[in-house]
Amino acid sequence: MKLPIYLDYAATTPVDPRVAEKMFQYMTMDGIFGNPASRSHRYGWQAEEAVDVARNQVAELINADHREIVFTSGATESNNLAIKGVAHFYNKKGKHIITSKTEHKAVLDTCRQLEREGFEVTYLEPEANGIIPMERLEAAMRDDTILVSIMHVNNEIGVIHDVDAIGELCRSKGIIFHMDAAQSAGKLPIDVQTTKVDLISISGHKMYGPKGIGALYVRRKPRIRLEAQMHGGGHERGMRSGTLATHQIVGLGEAAAIAKAEMATDNARIAKLRDKLWNGIKHIEETYVNGDMTHRVSGSLNVSFNYVEGESLMMALKDLAVSSGSACTSASLEPSYVLRALGLNDEMAHSSIRFSIGRFTTEEEIDHAIETITQSIDKLREMSPLWEMFKDGIDLNQVQWAHH
């Protein structure tokens, strides 16, 4: 068993060896290294063919037409292109956008930028289980609303939104619906023929593909128009200029094909390991799961251990590669804004750990994790005066702390 045990699959996944092997064939002189836009020789034609195959593989993952797939550098770029692209193209129609407080920073900061440009953004509060109620979304809609951007699966707590219902509501009101599927593509079935979603952001490195590659699904019927954010040679039907990175695109395509073929078996195995982990630690006193337990992606478990400081817990769990929130904001010592939006107080938000399990996690690793967590919590609480006060029956919310 390799230490530390990797339990941070929501931050990134290792590239599947089958994907890596395929990618190597598209880099060197011995392989297919040409520019897919070179139309005058075989090197270019072969590269273009490889890109076409990968485009089809990504399209098949979500049951789309291959012409609806635009390759980007990742979900952050896809989110920027979708949100800014719609806002700038449709701004004559309206300048109001709806999103939620628990979105990824790539959506929230893009919306903040649009606010600086004169757009108005409504940030919806989720329920305590992390889910946005439909009536709250509907109540926020206005005549000048042009876009709703709600993630499919939350990156910190793993809850799944009812994107079918959101899509129906948006379509009935003539509002464009963008869905950030970085955490769900390749893990949950997505079918654009049945779900009325107009734009979908996809990330390669969240589904055992390489980093630095992603895609944006852009619906053709009814047709969604975007204003390009990256200008140049007019690649990707003018929506995203820049030489296509054949080896990374091939990697994304292969990862999508594997995910589609193995999704059901992967999910069943991962859910079993996730349940084993939760059943192994839920007996620890004052331990709570964050987010809805039924509407949840199989590999995710966000747990708060009351009266334990999150950072000290992370240090105590040095054999486990876990995080206390999203990797993109884990460098800051602020409590997770996602957990705060769920109504957790700072202490509970600070004492939370995100465990995310994936394709290469083993049962032996979960056993070791349970043992490590149990021992670490016991040790840290032994040293905690707050735990002692709690055990003595003192209500810590009523304590008047002296400020020096």
UniProtKB/Swiss-Prot annotation:
Signal keyword on record: no
GO MF terms, alphabetically ordered: 2 iron, 2 sulfur cluster binding; cysteine desulfurase activity; metal ion binding; pyridoxal phosphate binding
Domain of life: Bacteria
Pathway annotation: Cofactor biosynthesis; iron-sulfur cluster biosynthesis
Enzyme Commission identifier(s): 2.8.1.7
PROSITE patterns: AA_TRANSFER_CLASS_5 (PS00595)
Cofactor: pyridoxal 5'-phosphate
One GO CC term, this protein: L-cysteine desulfurase complex
KW Cytoplasm (keyword) present: yes
Keyword annotations: 2Fe-2S, Cytoplasm, Iron, Iron-sulfur, Metal-binding, Pyridoxal phosphate, Transferase
Catalysed conversion reaction: (sulfur carrier)-H + L-cysteine = (sulfur carrier)-SH + L-alanine
Class of the enzyme per the UniProt entry, highest EC level: transferase
Subunit-level organization: Homodimer. Forms a heterotetramer with IscU, interacts with other sulfur acceptors.
Protein name: Cysteine desulfurase IscS
